């Protein structure tokens, strides 16, 4: 189980990303728009830098919903590989069976 502080930090990042998503998208679009002047694009980059660091979606980390494990997490299930294995063997994940050939 991951430390509670790490899980809370991730939740805080999720909230910040949601809060600043619109501004971040607007500034990013302006900064990448080559039809705009260089001054406008530079200003948009400066505004992006003024946003909180944790408002950037790339700082989010996928974690297991059960254990909070940051690595080996499958996006499709939102679970770590070890938990997927346990739940699959128990028959709790529909459509997942042990491979045999």
Swiss-Prot record:
Keywords, ordered alphabetically: Ribonucleoprotein, Ribosomal protein, RNA-binding, rRNA-binding
A GO cellular-component term linked to this record: cytoplasm
SUPFAM superfamilies recorded: Glucocorticoid receptor-like (DNA-binding domain)
Molecular function (Gene Ontology), one example: rRNA binding
GO biological process: translation
Domain of life of the organism encoding this protein: Bacteria
Pfam families assigned to the protein according to its UniProt record, in alphabetical order: Ribosomal_S14
Keyword Membrane in annotation: no
Disulfide bonds: none
PANTHER family: 30S RIBOSOMAL PROTEIN S14 (PTHR19836), SMALL RIBOSOMAL SUBUNIT PROTEIN US14M (PTHR19836:SF19)
Subunit-level organization: Part of the 30S ribosomal subunit. Contacts proteins S3 and S10.
Family named by the database record: Belongs to the universal ribosomal protein uS14 family.
Cited function: Binds 16S rRNA, required for the assembly of 30S particles and may also be responsible for determining the conformation of the 16S rRNA at the A site.
NCBIfam families: PRK08881.1
Protein name: Small ribosomal subunit protein uS14
Lineage: Bacteria, Pseudomonadati, Pseudomonadota, Betaproteobacteria, Burkholderiales
């Amino acid at each position: 189980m991951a430390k509670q502080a790490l899980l809370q930090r991730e939740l805080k990042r999720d909230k910040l990303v949601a809060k600043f998503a619109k501004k971040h998208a607007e500034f990013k679009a302006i900064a990448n728009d080559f039809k705009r002047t260089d001054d406008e694009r530079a200003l948009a980059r400066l505004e992006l830098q003024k946003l909180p660091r944790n408002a950037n979606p790339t700082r989010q980390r996928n974690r297991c919903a059960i254990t909070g494990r940051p690595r080996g997490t499958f996006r499709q299930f939102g679970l770590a590989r070890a938990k997927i294995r346990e739940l699959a063997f128990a028959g709790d994940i529909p459509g997942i069976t042990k491979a045999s050939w």
